[in-house]
């Protein structure tokens, strides 16, 4: 029996995971990132950037449903949505399922990601790039939110881990720009890593976001591909009531939206905001910082 090729993730120095590779479909080092897509017998097509798995066909729906339907249904009346990152198109796919949304803007730093994902991960976008409400902007996310005069109801930061090009999307200057770019009652969400292994990410995000939003918290979802299992998402708004909607309200909005999901449902929505005690403890011991260094 021939030995299978193995691909090793390099996110963590002392532990990690590997994937068997049936076929490498695409590999290219662009100006910004080292991109690879390969096929795995259990997870389907896998995309990795700079040695870190970003998405797989098998479980991407969990991540994308929770990053979109939680803020959109909590808001209830979103018309304009901004996606930072999301070049694989799956975030756009889920947002576009909400027919009440009038405009979807996506800012992606790397045009190469969009191009090769449309070809090699077509199920992620599922035709959403052709939605007439969609506008693609090739730009740095930090630059966009600090230069635009547009306002949005929901901003979704589909960022990579805070290394390389994704690092700037965890800074105070980015969070400040997002807060300024939201309409009244707007919601900001962002991926914040696997908290059990990357707790500092959540603590740092909470500390910085709290300077610009009066209600900052997190919600979670179980996503097998991401080593450690439980992915944490940052949540920030000026209206704490949006995080505390009752189940009946969410069930009504979910029914009106006509959504059929594979992971998200209103009960999952409510339960996702229940955080483990170790995270609550870490957040309550954050030292108070006087002043904000926008370069951090």
UniProtKB/Swiss-Prot annotation:
Enzyme class (EC, first level): transferase
Sequence intervals crossing the membrane: none
Lineage top rank: taxon: Bacteria
Enzyme active site: 158
Example of a GO MF term: spermidine synthase activity
Pathways per UniProt: Amine and polyamine biosynthesis; spermidine biosynthesis; spermidine from putrescine: step 1/1
Keyword Transferase: yes
Keywords recorded for this protein, A-Z: Cytoplasm, Polyamine biosynthesis, Spermidine biosynthesis, Transferase
Subcellular location(s) per record: Cytoplasm
Family (UniProt): Belongs to the spermidine/spermine synthase family.
Protein's name according to its UniProt entry: Polyamine aminopropyltransferase
UniProt organism field: Yersinia pseudotuberculosis serotype O:1b (strain IP 31758)
């Amino acid at each position: 029996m021939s030995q299978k090729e193995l691909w090793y993730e390099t996110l963590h120095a002392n532990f990690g995971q590997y994937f068997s590779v049936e076929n490498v479909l695409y590999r290219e080092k662009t100006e910004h990132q080292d991109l690879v897509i390969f096929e795995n017998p259990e997870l389907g097509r896998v995309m990795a950037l700079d040695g870190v798995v970003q998405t797989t066909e098998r479980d991407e729906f969990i991540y994308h449903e929770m990053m979109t339907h939680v803020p959109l249904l909590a808001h209830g009346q979103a018309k304009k949505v901004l996606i930072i990152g999301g070049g694989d198109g799956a975030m756009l796919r889920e947002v576009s399922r909400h027919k009440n949304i009038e405009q979807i803007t996506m800012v992606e730093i790397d045009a190469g990601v969009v191009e090769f994902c449309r070809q090699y991960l077509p199920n992620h976008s599922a035709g959403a790039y052709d939605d007439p409400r969609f506008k693609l902007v090739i730009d740095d996310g930090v630059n966009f939110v600090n230069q635009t005069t547009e306002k949005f109801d929901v901003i979704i930061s589909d960022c990579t881990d805070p290394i390389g090009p994704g690092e700037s999307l965890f800074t105070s200057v980015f969070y400040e720009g997002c807060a300024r770019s939201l309409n009244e009652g707007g919601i900001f969400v962002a991926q914040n890593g696997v908290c059990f292994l990357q707790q500092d990410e959540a603590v740092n995000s909470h500390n910085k976001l709290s300077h610009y939003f009066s209600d900052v918290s997190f919600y979670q979802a179980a996503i097998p591909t991401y080593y450690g299992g439980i992915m944490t998402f940052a949540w920030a708004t000026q209206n704490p009531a949006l995080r505390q909607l009752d189940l009946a309200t969410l069930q009504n909005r979910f029914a009106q939206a006509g959504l059929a999901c594979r992971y998200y449902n209103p009960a999952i929505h409510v339960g996702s905001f229940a955080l483990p005690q170790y995270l609550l403890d870490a957040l309550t011991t954050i030292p108070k910082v006087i002043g904000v260094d926008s370069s951090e």
